[in-house]
């Protein structure tokens, strides 16, 4: 996700820390620059600022297009891999966790998602874990496609609002393109019972399971403030519905038998199977 918060609940203890690089960034080498400002004139992202006596590149605006590098008459601009953030392998009270933190103004990418999923699968094999939960970002862009690739089930959380219905339809279309089964959770279902009913009806017509209708519950906020999951904080009706939803999700995933190399539920199984679910 672009602004993940799972670490606030799980308090991960880092076992491995790695730098993450994606794309490239330009940087002017002052000792080679003659101050002609050709780079500033050519940049269409206004990343190069006219300088006195020499220009400078604003790294927050640079898109890494390399046009300044190509047109610099004195070869004064370096083009190096962009250090975008840090990724971690951590231990939590609920199991291993592969996650990352990007620097300000750095965008999530399919490459980062794929990297984390790759290491999550490695951890699962090493520790005999049969199920991986991948937290997917909103929308239908590259990070979402990377998060959905090869999963056995997509769990989509929506809300009964016009924008929620619209975004849900887009994600379900994307899952349909990749032949990924979908399970839907309607969050804050009491926000608009009418729209919640329309969502459920549409899901049934499209063959998607609605595994839970969760009411608005302030216990989510109270649990988050204490750094705990709601299932650790409360035992009310919402928690009961969440546990029922989890049982339904596990049943839908239908874990493959060890050694079965066949494709299961539209996703590729592994020789030592690790079922992956996108949430």
Spans of model-derived segments:
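Hydrophobic alpha-helical segments and helix pairs
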Residues: 61-99
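Phosphate-binding/switch loop-helix module in NTP-utilizing enzymes
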Residues: 40, 49-52, 58-65, 69, ...
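Cysteine-centered iron-sulfur cluster-binding motifs in ferredoxin-type domains/subunits
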Residues: 27-46, 56-76
